[in-house]
Amino acid sequence: MSQAVETRTRIKSERYESGVIPYAKMGYWDPEYSIKETDILALFRCTPQPGVDPVEAAAALAGESSTATWTVVWTDLLTACDLYRAKAYRVDPVPSAADTYFCYIAYDIDLFEEGSLANLTASIIGNIFGFKAVKALRLEDMRMPYALLKTYQGPATGLIVERERLDKFGRPLLGATVKPKLGLSGKNYGRVVFEGLKGGLDFLKDDENINSQPFMRYRERFLYSMEGVNHAAAVSGEVKGHYLNATAATMEDMYERAEFAKDLGSVIVMIDLVIGYTAIQSMAIWARKTDMILHLHRAGNSTYSRQKSHGMNFRVICKWMRMSGVDHIHAGTVVGKLEGDPLMIKGFYNTLLEFKSDINLPQGLFFAQDWASLRKCVPVASGGIHCGQMHQLINYLGDDVVLQFGGGTIGHPDGIQAGATANRVALECMVIARNEGRDYISEGPQILRDAAKTCGPLQTALDLWKDITFNYASTDTADFVETPTANR
């Protein structure tokens, strides 16, 4: 080897060590790291492959979700790599889960584009979930720094303004989803809307998969639905509404549908989670500019949020959607037909509604969070609930929620209007009992029976659904306390 080659080789080796080096030795593991107020923090539940050290697995997650690749590259020397490397700083074993660990990772704020959920998620969940070194991986929680949150608009309207527009205070908002989801003509669809609103509901809504199919194009549905809204408002003297689903194949189509809804006098439009983060943020910006309420159906979330070992906890989706700017999001019922452990659901609701939250491990909240004055995002409870559960719903979910009774309204034997009346009476009698200081939780069934003595539709509903419960064990439960799912 010539002297010149030897010199170049020596200089190169002094500048950086080439080849494949463990991530922990490359600077992605730092147990002494001092967390900055501006850091984005993420907590992963990680099950490493057999033989993989959990610290190395955590460092690999930090590396592959920030600056690293599988081998050392000389272009690291051209960047402020010590700054831009994510730092895994803590690894804890998961209680009652062998060979599974909580991995805490800190990301410098400059790794992310301001106000871009797509960019944030491209790093945090973009690549590492297919990493061979881990058998399973789940994003459990995140802390968003104040400085980052100030680059997001948050909910366009917020709960307080929505209550003022509806003139509804001191109780949950009451609604229903039109059933059947698919197949109705526009005229019959509008009839369902009118009957439900006339019976006492505040809103009705489209379901996630009703868009603009051959049996009913969106214009027809929007026209007949708003006719029902206006008629019911005139008859009842109350402010009414209907969540018109503007979900479509392209942004151009969604804007067109949302504008049509606005032109018809609607105060709210709806989108589905499956349209993607960029589309959600785009629609949220449109909603704020046009002074519209934006409802989000979480369609598709359980494909990655339900299983405890792999995917993403729904509380992270709640945080991202509050940042993105939606006003409503479906967040669970506890007692309904869909997945929902009581403590986990409480954590979701607190994430959406509180301006500041502390660490609460039983609820799955691993980080304290200051929401930088972003408005509240209203949780929606929907799926398999009925008026006989009203005391449980108010106990678990409180007032700041939209209760959606689909089958529990439209399945009433005496018709849609009767179903709506049963739900309205059940809600109001339970709120009155609570406000009077009664033990409405234990006395709930009797409170409902007493109200039903003067409300035939409520009595019919209680007789029909009195034995309907969904007592299945939740798959996503707290790691730090036993929380059996039961409808008591």
From Swiss-Prot:
HAMAP family: RuBisCO_L_type1. The active site is at K179, H297. One of its GO terms (molecular function) is ribulose-bisphosphate carboxylase activity. The record marks K337 as: Transition state stabilizer. Substrate binds at N127, T177, K181, R298, H330, S382. The basic functional RuBisCO is composed of a large chain homodimer in a 'head-to-tail' conformation. In form I RuBisCO this homodimer is arranged in a barrel-like tetramer with the small subunits forming a tetrameric 'cap' on each end of the 'barrel'. CDD domains: RuBisCO_large_I. Binds 1 Mg(2+) ion per subunit. The gene is rbcL. Disulfide bonds: none annotated. It catalyses: 2 (2R)-3-phosphoglycerate + 2 H(+) = D-ribulose 1,5-bisphosphate + CO2 + H2O; D-ribulose 1,5-bisphosphate + O2 = 2-phosphoglycolate + (2R)-3-phosphoglycerate + 2 H(+). PANTHER family: RIBULOSE BISPHOSPHATE CARBOXYLASE (PTHR42704), RIBULOSE BISPHOSPHATE CARBOXYLASE LARGE CHAIN (PTHR42704:SF17). Its cofactor is Mg(2+). Mg(2+) binds at K205, D207, E208. The modification N6-carboxylysine is found at K205. One of its GO terms (biological process) is reductive pentose-phosphate cycle. It comes from the Eukaryota. RuBisCO catalyzes two reactions: the carboxylation of D-ribulose 1,5-bisphosphate, the primary event in carbon dioxide fixation, as well as the oxidative fragmentation of the pentose substrate in the photorespiration process. Both reactions occur simultaneously and in competition at the same active site. Its EC number is 4.1.1.39. It comes from Chrysotila carterae. This is Ribulose bisphosphate carboxylase large chain. The keyword Chloroplast applies. Belongs to the RuBisCO large chain family. Type I subfamily. Its main location: plastid. InterPro entries: RuBisCO (IPR033966), RuBisCo_large_chain_AS (IPR020878), RuBisCO_lsu_C (IPR000685), RuBisCO_lsu_C_sf (IPR036376), RuBisCO_lsu_fd_N (IPR017443), RuBisCO_lsu_N_sf (IPR036422), RuBisCO_lsuI (IPR020888). It is found in: Plastid, Chloroplast. Keywords: Calvin cycle, Carbon dioxide fixation, Chloroplast, Lyase, Magnesium, Metal-binding, Monooxygenase, Oxidoreductase, Photorespiration, Photosynthesis, Plastid.
